[in-house]
Amino acid sequence: MMKLYNFSVLWLLLLPLAFTSFVHANEAIVNLHLASPSNTDTPRNHYIHALLTLAFAEQGKQVDFIYSIRPMNKKRVVEELSKASSINLAWLSLPANSYPDLHHTSLSIYQGLHGKPLLIINKNQQPRFAEISTSAQLKPLIALQKQSWSDYDVLIRNGFTVNGELDYKGMTRALETGLADYFPRSVSAIAAEVTKLQHQNLMIEQTIMLQYPSHYYFYTHKQNDALLMELEAGLLKLQKNGKFAQLYQQFFGEKERDLALSSRKVFHLN
């Protein structure tokens, strides 16, 4: 009986310590609820995963990535993020002060890279594009872009002709059949995309780069400011110790060199 009593007392003494350890373990894990990409062919963003993992590690945290069951386009992502319910973080390029309930980090995730799209074209059309020397010559040609994508608004605002009604497969078919002329795509993804599309007689146009101000930040609802502050602190540490720049070069440095960005004709948009 005495042994049972002693064991009970010991358990009561250890219980708070065990509970405290459990709480501290849970506090060291950050659950990030993210949106699954609307294009099911798009792989998970390894750069974003690596950046978030490093940033929270600087704060002594581990990250658990939890993706939504249903895919979301940009419009849906903003809507869900504004509800502060299903997702709690997204990386977006949004007009300044357009969503007062959403707060964002201060450092540009891609260092403006998404504002330098290249063009996917039909291989037979490269000589035609090589002769284009001004944006005015490009504007009458039919560009492809989904209306929910940020490039669509930029192209329309700058007077380009854009078909925004097709899904991704429809766009690539339109290029192949000559119903459209070019498909602006991010430097970060265009090479991988064209590799997948090689059976469709498509290529990366070799001479032109569009450029406009575009900066992606991590956004969350203002109710999640504690999460955002933790992430911001981690990102600033990465910037200070050079790991941010190192990670960017690891993922995009070679792509920038291989795509010869510095030697292309640049058409500046606003």
Where is each model-derived feature located?
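Ligand-binding clefts/hinges and TM-proximal coupling segments of bilobed small-molecule sensing domains
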Residues: 146-157, 235-270
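A conserved helix-loop-strand patch within extracytoplasmic ligand-binding domains
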Residues: 110-153
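Short loop->beta-strand "edge-of-pocket" segments that line small-molecule binding or catalytic clefts
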Residues: 28-45, 130-148, 181-182
